[in-house]
Each structure stands twice: as structure tokens, then as C-alpha cells.
Design a protein with these regions (language model features):
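Acidic-basic catalytic patches of nuclease active cores, encompassing PD-(D/E)XK
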Residues: 1-34
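Conserved catalytic cores of phosphodiester-cleaving nucleases, focusing on short active-site segments
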Residues: 35-51, 55, 62, 69-71
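Long, low-complexity, charged/polar intrinsically disordered regions in eukaryotic proteins
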Residues: 93-174
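Positively charged, polyanion-binding regions of nucleic-acid-associated proteins
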Residues: 168-187
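Short acidic, hydrophobic short linear motifs in intrinsically disordered regions
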Residues: 184-209
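Short amphipathic alpha-helical interaction segments
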Residues: 209-227
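A short, conserved structural fragment
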Residues: 226-237
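Short, cationic-aromatic polyanion-contact patches
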Residues: 236-246
Length: 246
């Protein structure tokens, strides 16, 4: 039977895993905030399974108070979809063709980018496999959060963690600059960056659709990096703007 909580199973599982790993306590009041985890050293760990930028006010406040903050963000590289009838009977189970790459997190950073290079902030990205549970509906429906452009005959119920494949930490300029493939020339255009990202992921045996989706984030990557003072505009090449790393 599917269970529904305000806190997702994925969030809850990661919270308890990190609390055990860091000998921390969960749901701890810190000033006006309730923090997912506070370690025995007073460091804060926040689990964010959706838009990282939603944590901006909380993160800024904690950093201003001198806290070390780690944001843990799961990135789904493999998803199994289970669909259930309203009575809880399982009717289908399949693998989703969609696989996220590291570039999928960029959009969720657009509001928090001023804090990303703060010395006391670490972004820890988990590459995970999950099972997503859905409930069949009698008629097509939209979601309350308005995230659907078109009605569908199912609603999401739960996301369950299956495994953590690996972790990547982003804290320094060098960490973030690793998102720019080393094959790029010193001065480059957005099409150059798109091609380099696509080629790099192909070498890593990423499927074509995921490579294309990642390459399409090149413009957003440069939007972020120019504001983080990692990249600057340096001229024109035809109609294309030239960029270079700083």
C-alpha cells in the first residue's frame, strides 16, 4: 500500500542516513529555523530533493551566524516507475528512459548562486537510483503545484531511495569549473560549450537524450558562471558572444 507524507520517503531516508553518518540530531531548532540535521559540532546539513534555491533565505541566515552548512541534493540517474490502482494494487513496473546528469541541477541554483562560493557552504550531489510510485486516476488531472502543462491519468505518490551510486562535492571555484569540459579553447561560444558537454558525456557512455538535455543547459551554465565571477564575456565571433574562464 502506498503511503503519503508531507515529508517524502526519499527526503526522510537521506535525513536519517546523514544523521547516523555524522552523529547528528534531526529536526533541530536553530534560531527561527528548523534544520534537518545538526551535527555534534554544530554544523547544519539540509536535505533538498527539489529546488535548491528555496533554501536561500535559510542558508544565508545560517551562514551569517557562522554555521557550516552542507546542502545534500539527490540527482536521479536511474528511476523505476511503479503505477498503482487507487486500492493499492500494483498494475505496472518499468524503468524510466530519463537519466539526469550533473547539469540537471543548474536550474535549481539560479536563486542561491550568490552563496555557492561561501567558504562555509558545501553542495553535496548524490547520484541515486530511486523507485517512483504513482497512483492511477479515472480521468486526466493536473497537479496542485501547476507543474504539468497537460493533464495526465496518474498522480505522484512517493519516491523511495534504492541506492547511492556516488557523491560529488561542490565548494570551491575549481569544483564548479570542473563542469566546463577541459577540451574547450580558452575563448569559446555557447555552441562550442554545447558541443563539448555533449562529447564529454558521450565519452562517459551517457545516452543520447541525456547528452542533448545536458548540452541544452550550456546557456544557463554561463549565466550562472558569469554571475559567480568564474567566466566573463570577451568579445564576439560573428553573431555569437565569446566567453573565457577567469
Amino acid at each position: 500500500m502506498i503511503q503519503t507524507y508531507n515529508e517524502s520517503d526519499l527526503h526522510r531516508t537521506l535525513k536519517h542516513l546523514y544523521a547516523l553518518e555524522h552523529n547528528g540530531k534531526t529536526e533541530v531548532p536553530v534560531g527561527k529555523w528548523i534544520c534537518d540535521i545538526v551535527t555534534e559540532n554544530g554544523d547544519v546539513i539540509e536535505i533538498q530533493t527539489a529546488n535548491i534555491s528555496k533554501l536561500t533565505p535559510k542558508t544565508k541566515s545560517l551562514l551569517d551566524d557562522g554555521r557550516n552548512v552542507t546542502i545534500v541534493y539527490p540527482l536521479v540517474i536511474e528511476k523505476t516507475i511503479e503505477t498503482y490502482m487507487p486500492d493499492g494494487a500494483l498494475i505496472s513496473r518499468r524503468k524510466s528512459p530519463k537519466k539526469q546528469t550533473i547539469y540537471a541541477m543548474l536550474r535549481s541554483l539560479t536563486g542561491i548562486y550568490p552563496l555557492l562560493l561561501h567558504g562555509n557552504l558545501t553542495l553535496e550531489v548524490l547520484f541515486v537510483t530511486i523507485t517512483e510510485q504513482r497512483r492511477k486516476t479515472a480521468t486526466p488531472v493536473r497537479l496542485a503545484n501547476k507543474s504539468r502543462h497537460f493533464p495526465k491519468t496518474w498522480v505522484p505518490q512517493e519516491k523511495k531511495l534504492e541506492s547511492i551510486i556516488r557523491k560529488e562535492r561542490y565548494k570551491t571555484k575549481a569544483d564548479y569549473m570542473a563542469l566546463i569540459p577541459p577540451t574547450l579553447p580558452h575563448e569559446f561560444t555557447i555552441p562550442n560549450l554545447q558541443k563539448a558537454i555533449f562529447s564529454k558525456l558521450q565519452e562517459d557512455k551517457t545516452n543520447k537524450n541525456s547528452c542533448t538535455a545536458a548540452a541544452n543547459q550550456a546557456r544557463l551554465l554561463l549565466w550562472l558562471f558569469t554571475r559567480m565571477d568564474l567566466v566573463e564575456k570577451c568579445g564576439k565571433q560573428g553573431r555569437c558572444t565569446l566567453y573565457r574562464t577567469k
